[in-house]
Curated annotation (Swiss-Prot):
HAMAP family: UPF0276 (MF_00697). SUPFAM superfamilies: Xylose isomerase-like. InterPro entries: MbnB/TglH/ChrH, Xyl_isomerase-like_sf. Belongs to the UPF0276 family. It holds the Pfam family MbnB_TglH_ChrH. This is UPF0276 protein NMCC_2101. It comes from Neisseria meningitidis serogroup C (strain 053442). Coiled coil: none annotated.
Amino acid sequence: MIQHAGLGYRRDLAEDFLSLSENSPICFIEAAPENWLKMGGWARKQFDRVAERLPLALHGLSMSLGGQAPLDTDLIDGIKEMMRRYDCTFFSDHLSYCHDGGHLYDLLPLPFTEEMVHHTARRIREVQDRLGCRIAVENTSYYLHSPLAEMNEVEFLNAVAREADCGIHLDVNNIYVNAVNHGLLSPEAFLKNVDADRVCYIHIAGHDVETPELLIDTHGAAVLPTVWDLLELAYAKLPTIPPTLLERDFNFPPFAELEAEVAKIADYQTRAGKEYRRAA
């Protein structure tokens, strides 16, 4: 089961994961299934060895939950088989679309409308029915706000999760990035109003500061103090402490620095003084 604090698995870090000490703060790993469904060779052997040691969460990149194109049933079936193979009980994907007759290789924002709530929730239910389990949806960073919006971001997230009866995968860094870039919803208001009982998993990551008014969610830097503060606030507002993962995709520092950030997550979890939640 997925619990406590974890770190995203990346091929560049394989040897570090294989060399983890018994007292490492890393309690689980996360991987994008799209990167591994057809992967073989030495990289797959290393991944398998790490997945034997640590519980695995799957976080998708290309389900296109809000898209108009039919859902990719081959992808869903591949994820289901990967979950079976690795005894994985958790899958999440982004509340976005990324497919329009072909993969767009980006996570594009959805208009916050009632129509899109119903459309996206229906597709999430289809995914859950085919996988045979509940999934979670993640709030994404976005850089263009639709003029069609009928509600704010957290209202949209709550409405989709409620209608689909799915979990919420809360990305704390994305909350902060969107608040700065758009000025529409403060991070504090987001955390106050999110459906706390549905929050079952958390991401935290670093971002790039292009200008004081433009932040880019890159996962390529250390977590900034303002985002750590939001994580602490999230733990204070949630009824239990969800599994929380540090995302780092490139510009890798020495592995000890990543472990130190994961240890900081674990410290915040302990200080919150609440029951730990398992992602399932």
